[in-house]
Amino acid sequence: MANAKKKKMTFMESLKAQFSTKSLVLIPIAVGINLIGGTLCSTLKLPLFLDMIGTIVIACLSGPWVSALCGLLTNVFLALVANPVYLPYSLVSIFCGLVTGYMVKAGLFKKIWGVILTWLACSLSITFSASLITIFVYGGATGVTGTSVVTATLIAATKDIVVSVFSSSMLENLIDKAIAFAIAYVIVKKIPRRFLSQYASDATDDDDED
């Protein structure tokens, strides 16, 4: 009966359900987590980003569109407090939130293999979108994090900007998102069930626990 009701839920009803009071409280917390990770990597020039941990967590707890908003707000704040370079990458963060959120909604966070599949899908989609922005907006490198050093090294070796940007972005995102998904998975699993919304309980609890 519950599944039948969920299938009949319209997009607007689903959107309204995602933006619950709990979700509105979680958004600034998730954005804060993203800002800490992103600012730290930017300041230390690390070849990582770590600015989507909160986005992944809230995708599990509240849904894809709340996660997309979290990603957008994160990049807007990073552009204001760290570097304007982050602003165009808002699209990447939104994409990450939607991809992760819908895969979580499909129940893929219930098992480790599903988490791995979600990580790979998110990493690949982010690599494609971020690489296009890096190439067409910034000419191949941004200089914000240590990732630009990797890209510059590959460009010097291959003499091909497109191949270099996509290759470095793929490597960096696989590593970065592996860390982000691992941390997010641990956080979500550590949250007591009574504090989870019905969405989070349905999307992340193991089937054998129901």
Show the residue positions of the predicted features:
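Extended, non-catalytic scaffold segments that flank or surround catalytic motifs
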Residues: 71-79, 98-102, 106, 205-210
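Regular secondary-structure segments
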Residues: 74-81, 137, 141
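Membrane-helix interface segments
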Residues: 64-69, 73, 107-113, 161
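Short helix-perturbing small/polar motifs within transmembrane alpha-helices
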Residues: 2-36, 88-139, 185-189
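Hydrophobic core segments of transmembrane alpha-helices in multi-pass, intramembrane catalytic enzymes
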Residues: 51, 55, 92-97, 180
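Hydrophobic transmembrane alpha-helices
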Residues: 2-61, 65-76, 84-86
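Membrane-embedded alpha-helical hairpins and interfacial helices in multi-pass inner-membrane proteins
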Residues: 43-49, 86-88, 110-210
